[in-house]
Amino acid sequence: GYNYMKEKAILLTSDFYRSNLNFKLNYEPNKKTKLEFSTRYSRTKVNGDGQSDATGDQNSVPSGSFGRIRHAVMQSPLTGSGSLLFDESNIDDGLEDPITALNDNYKKRVRENFNMNGAFTWKILPELTFRTDVGLDIYNNDFRYFAGSTTYESQNNTLAEFKNMPLTTRTQVNRRTVRNSNTLQYDFSKILPKIHSLNLMVGQESIVSRETLATTRIEGFPTFYDADMAFHLSAQGTPTRANEFYYPDDKMVSFFGRANYSLLDRYLLTATLRADGSSKFSKGNRWGYFPSVAAGWRI
């Protein structure tokens, strides 16, 4: 299936786009085997200042640029004789008009998610079933910010030779996660008397995640550049910062088992045990064990 959504935001220069594509397939070659496959892709694009960045929106348009009513004139700017009460050069108090403020504080974010899962089930015997699952998740987040010559960022946080000149920053996050699980399940119904029912399952799961973070900053664009020009003609600026960080691989391995027992299909008992080992913890503390027991009675 496919769906697409476009939304025009209330704030000028801001809009939102989202598209989703998904596919699912189940196939049984014979009575003993089954194949399952599903995939999903989504892409979201948000333009304009109506969003927050990873730094807590510190570079967004100041609220004073929009809250003009809060700063409305509370008294006449004229004296009784009709002359100005204030110096004309200071009337605006350094504030930019809202349209300029929006255009000079422009953000563009593109998020992509890709998910793919596959499974194979094999009924080795009528009471013995094997299943393996494989999954892949890909996440990309590309955030770009343009600060024009009227912004605080351009006027105060740039190199001296690029003061009051437009700049851009870009943050890219890429994450890949691979998952695999294998389970073996046995049903003892044919072995035990009919008043008893017992099902055992054992399994193993592994998850590996890798992530990178890249940040760049380009200053010194010509003063007439807008966001679109700066994003597409980045060679006209001067790179002042470029960092790329590779996070340590995040790995987790799990072993688990479960037993389901019932007597007369009325008295129920379930016991599970799971052991998880994670690379996030130091050696000697990487393994955790999680047993549980549950009982039930059908009245």
Each predicted region: which residue ranges?
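Residues on the lipid-exposed face of transmembrane beta-strands in outer-membrane beta-barrel proteins
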Residues: 23-27, 116-122, 182-186, 257-261, ...
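Transmembrane beta-barrel architecture of outer membranes
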Residues: 16-22, 254, 290
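Surface-exposed loop/interface segments of Gram-negative outer-membrane beta-barrel transport/assembly proteins
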Residues: 9-10, 14, 24-113, 133, ...
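Short, contiguous hydrophobic alpha-helices characteristic of membrane insertion segments
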Residues: 257-272
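Transmembrane beta-strand segments that form the barrel wall of outer-membrane beta-barrel proteins
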Residues: 2-8, 269-281, 299
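Short glycine/threonine-rich loop-to-helix capping motif typified by GTGT followed
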Residues: 283-288
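Active-site-proximal loop/short-helix segments
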Residues: 138, 275-277, 289
